[in-house]
UniProtKB/Swiss-Prot annotation:
It comes from Methylibium petroleiphilum (strain ATCC BAA-1232 / LMG 22953 / PM1). This is Small ribosomal subunit protein uS10. Transmembrane segments: none annotated. Belongs to the universal ribosomal protein uS10 family. Pfam families: Ribosomal_S10.
Length: 103
């Protein structure tokens, strides 16, 4: 039988929140007997915006804003049924986006 793998990708604006969530997922998977590879930090995506301060003149006066999207990747190799059930019941914070792929 072919080995199954679960790939989990986390995205969040706050790096503390994403690290905490990754740690919870790793602990849950290890408790149920699965092998975990990761979390691997992926490159942080930065979006920068320049906005004029004044509504009419003073083009040289601008505000700069930045949004950073942090990402983590982890693989769960050869998961058991217990692992899948435990991951489904796991309650993660609202600011973390989770993508799960079965391979």
């Amino acid at each position: 039988m072919q080995k199954q793998k679960i790939r989990i990708r986390l995205k969040a604006f706050d790096y503390k929140l994403i690290d905490q969530s990754a740690l919870e997922i790793v602990d849950t998977a290890k408790r149920t007997g699965a092998i975990v590879k990761g979390p691997v930090p992926l490159p942080t995506r930065m979006q920068r915006f320049d906005i004029l301060r004044s509504p009419h003149v003073n083009k040289s006066s601008r505000d700069q804003f930045e949004i950073r999207t942090h990402q983590r990747l982890m693989d769960i190799v050869d998961p058991t049924d217990k692992t899948v059930d435990a991951l489904m019941k796991l309650d993660l914070p609202a600011g973390v986006d989770v993508e799960i792929k079965l391979q």
